[in-house]
Amino acid sequence: MEERININVSATNYDQSSGGIRTILTAVVEMVHEENEFRITDSEFAFGWHFYVVSINRLLIQKLADQMGEDFQKLKGKSLEKKFLKWFSQKIQEKNLKAKLAIKEEMESGKYGIF
């Protein structure tokens, strides 16, 4: 079974942010010659924010890291997931998307409170 990394997204505009995220990830898929390696869920709206999850095949992220080489390794973060999250956040900022990202498994751990 494929291993996936789930990223929680919080955004004020679902259509704009999910469209931008889809564009970024489609470019990655094409760059590393993979297919259908990510999924974006529908959003839940609360307190003026849209909350949704982007699920990405870990193999896609590994291939991106391999292709970027040293540039990827220089990104801040200890793990592959953290480095990818940093890279992904930078791409979202470049597109002026108003969205915040967090690795889902970390959000559900005790690090951020009791869930």
Descriptions of predicted regions:
Residues E30-R39, I92-K100:
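Structural alpha-beta junctions
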Residues E34-L75:
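Short, intrinsically disordered low-complexity segments
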